[in-house]
Amino acid sequence: MSLLLPDSGLLFWMFVAFGVVFVILAKYGFPIIIKMVEGRKTYIDQSLEVAREANAQLAHLKEEGEALVAAANKEQGRILKEAMEERDKIVHEARKQAEIAAQKELDAVKQQIQIEKDEAIRDIRRQVAVLSVDIAEKVLRKNLQDKESQMGMIDRMLDEVLTPNKN
């Protein structure tokens, strides 16, 4: 008997034993194994489908998140633009108000200066008039000490008043 080639009787009983085991497995074992493999296949298919759906939902959520971020950035830009426009408007208005207030203050100061100038001129004129009268009085007293010079002065003044101004 060779180790590599079995005898025909041994070969027969090996086929019979194999056939019996195969029939028992085919009748009772394979359906259960096939059922378990099918169940496992169904479970794996369902898991793959759930994973695909989860990936799709994740991609959709990612797109929604990106859209929300883009919308938020756009809104932020709009709000910043409005804030800058409002700031510029407020600054412009404040400058305008400051210019108006400065102009009013300047006008008031100019008016006050003009009033004080007019008052000073009136005061100077009064003082000049008083001084002129005093000087004229002193000059007249000195020049008109006699009656004849007084009468001459009165006549000259009357002539000046009665004749129209030639100047």
Swiss-Prot record:
Chief location: membrane
Any one GO cellular component localisation term in the record: plasma membrane
InterPro entries assigned to the protein according to its UniProt record, in alphabetical order: ATP_synth_b/b'su_bac/chlpt (IPR002146), ATP_synth_F0_bsu_bac (IPR005864), ATP_synthase_B_chain (IPR050059)
Transmembrane residue ranges: 14-34
Its membrane topology: Single-pass membrane protein
Keywords: ATP synthesis, Cell inner membrane, Cell membrane, CF(0), Hydrogen ion transport, Ion transport, Membrane, Transmembrane, Transmembrane helix, Transport
Location of the protein in the cell: Cell inner membrane
GO molecular function, one term: proton-transporting ATP synthase activity, rotational mechanism
Similarity field: Belongs to the ATPase B chain family.
Assembly description: F-type ATPases have 2 components, F(1) - the catalytic core - and F(0) - the membrane proton channel. F(1) has five subunits: alpha(3), beta(3), gamma(1), delta(1), epsilon(1). F(0) has three main subunits: a(1), b(2) and c(10-14). The alpha and beta chains form an alternating ring which encloses part of the gamma chain. F(1) is attached to F(0) by a central stalk formed by the gamma and epsilon chains, while a peripheral stalk is formed by the delta and b chains.
Function: F(1)F(0) ATP synthase produces ATP from ADP in the presence of a proton or sodium gradient. F-type ATPases consist of two structural domains, F(1) containing the extramembraneous catalytic core and F(0) containing the membrane proton channel, linked together by a central stalk and a peripheral stalk. During catalysis, ATP synthesis in the catalytic domain of F(1) is coupled via a rotary mechanism of the central stalk subunits to proton translocation.
Name of this protein: ATP synthase subunit b
